[in-house]
């Protein structure tokens, strides 16, 4: 008699506990399932199964607040400053994943946390590499054509020539020597600039080396 009465009491308590929370149903094997109905689209969203009724009720509250905001009807009382950061542990059905539309309602994280953040080291290296490429591919020099003295003019160089003149662009970005390659500022009214002399001297020495290495033919 005592065992039967205890079983009845336990069943009644479970029924009361099951009907106590919104969107919570007790499974025959003892776990609790949570689901919610969207009042705007009239669709039902499956939230998962939980060990306790309180966890299932909390999952329902998170989904309800994500749909209707502070006007949602919830199982527990929440203030406006309450943050629903704690997600209850739940077991997913075999056909469900965290990316499904129903489980997305449980995610109450800030919008920026759902995106990948660029690696600051790789991004800074790419910026240095891009800046060094732009610096090595163009340079400015001064010229004198009579009326226009000290005017600036940009000349584009091939990649192979610019790399040989100013050093490889990866090394420039690695050792932070880009400041030594800032050409293009006009020096007052002087007809010649250091950059132009440097390029001319380099080309002359290069042509001299080529001529010296060329085979000599006897006439």
UniProtKB/Swiss-Prot annotation:
The record's principal subcellular location, in a coarse class, is nucleus
Task: Name one cellular component (GO) term.
Answer: nucleus
Q: Which GO terms describe its molecular function?
A: DNA binding; DNA-binding transcription factor activity
Give the record's keywords alphabetically: Activator, DNA-binding, Ethylene signaling pathway, Nucleus, Transcription, Transcription regulation
Q: Which residues bind DNA?
A: 20-77
Q: Which Gene3D superfamilies match?
A: AP2/ERF domain (3.30.730.10)
Q: What does this protein do?
A: Probably acts as a transcriptional activator. Binds to the GCC-box pathogenesis-related promoter element. May be involved in the regulation of gene expression by stress factors and by components of stress signal transduction pathways.
Similarity remark: Belongs to the AP2/ERF transcription factor family. ERF subfamily.
What is the protein named? Ethylene-responsive transcription factor ERF088
Which organism is this entry from? Arabidopsis thaliana
Name of the gene this protein is made from? ERF088
């Amino acid at each position: 008699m005592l065992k039967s009465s205890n079983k009845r009491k336990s069943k009644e308590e479970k029924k009361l506990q099951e009907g106590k929370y919104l969107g919570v149903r007790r499974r025959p094997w003892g776990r609790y399932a949570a689901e919610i109905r969207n009042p705007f689209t009239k669709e039902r969203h499956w939230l998962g199964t939980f060990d306790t009724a309180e966890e299932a009720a909390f999952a329902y509250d998170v989904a309800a607040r994500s749909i209707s905001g502070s006007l949602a009807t919830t199982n527990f009382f929440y203030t406006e400053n309450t943050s629903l950061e704690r997600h209850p542990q739940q077991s997913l059905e075999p056909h469900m994943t965290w990316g499904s539309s129903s489980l997305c309602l449980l995610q109450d994280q800030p919008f920026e946390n759902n995106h990948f953040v660029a690696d600051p080291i790789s991004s800074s290296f790419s910026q240095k590499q891009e800046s060094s490429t732009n610096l090595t591919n163009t340079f400015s020099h001064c010229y004198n054509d009579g009326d226009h003295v000290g005017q600036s003019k940009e000349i584009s160089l091939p990649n192979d020539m610019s790399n040989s003149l100013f050093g490889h662009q990866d090394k420039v970005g690695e050792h932070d020597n880009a400041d030594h390659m800032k050409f293009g500022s006009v020096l007052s009214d002087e007809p010649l600039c250091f950059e132009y002399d440097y390029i001319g001297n380099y080309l002359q020495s290069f042509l001299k080396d080529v001529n010296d290495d060329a085979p000599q033919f006897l006439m």
